[in-house]
């Protein structure tokens, strides 16, 4: 029994110590995202490819492809650390990666839950 208990303790201590530090970002619904981006101090970031962005995007957003090897460097030279970032991708997978990278670098990040697909499904404004 003591071995079992020790094993459980070891498992949980390992689990909690392996969590990455510094990844603090918030998932927000399309409605919350719309409220956030109504604030002119919020930076709008589309992390999809240039082709996807060119097809259609949320008005006022800038595009930095998270799959670009230089994503972090481009973001640092383009974005302001003292202003929060509201970011999105197509469905949420790439934006999670971008949110993790940016939050580790000290940015305050909000990620659009369900991405651009969720945004469009709720009838929110887009531009081409």
Please provide the spans of the model-predicted regions:
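Structural scaffold elements adjacent to functional motifs in cytosolic proteins
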Residues: 44-46
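Short, surface-exposed ligand- or partner-binding patches at beta-edge/loop junctions that are enriched
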Residues: 88
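Rhodanese-like catalytic fold shared by cysteine-dependent sulfurtransferases
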Residues: 2-5, 16-36, 42, 51-84, ...
């Amino acid at each position: 029994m003591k071995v079992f208990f020790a094993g459980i303790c070891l498992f949980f201590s390992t689990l909690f110590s392996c969590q990455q530090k510094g990844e603090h970002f918030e998932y927000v619904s399309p409605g919350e995202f719309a409220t956030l981006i109504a604030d002119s101090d919020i930076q709008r970031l589309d992390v999809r490819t240039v082709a996807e962005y060119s097809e259609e995007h949320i008005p006022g957003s800038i595009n930095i492809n998270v799959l670009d090897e230089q994503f972090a460097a481009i973001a640092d030279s383009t974005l302001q650390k003292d202003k929060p970032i509201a970011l999105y991708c197509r469905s949420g997978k790439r934006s999670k990666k971008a949110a993790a990278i940016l939050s580790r670098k000290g940015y305050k990040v909000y990620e659009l839950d369900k991405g651009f697909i969720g945004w469009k499904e709720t009838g929110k404004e887009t531009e081409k």
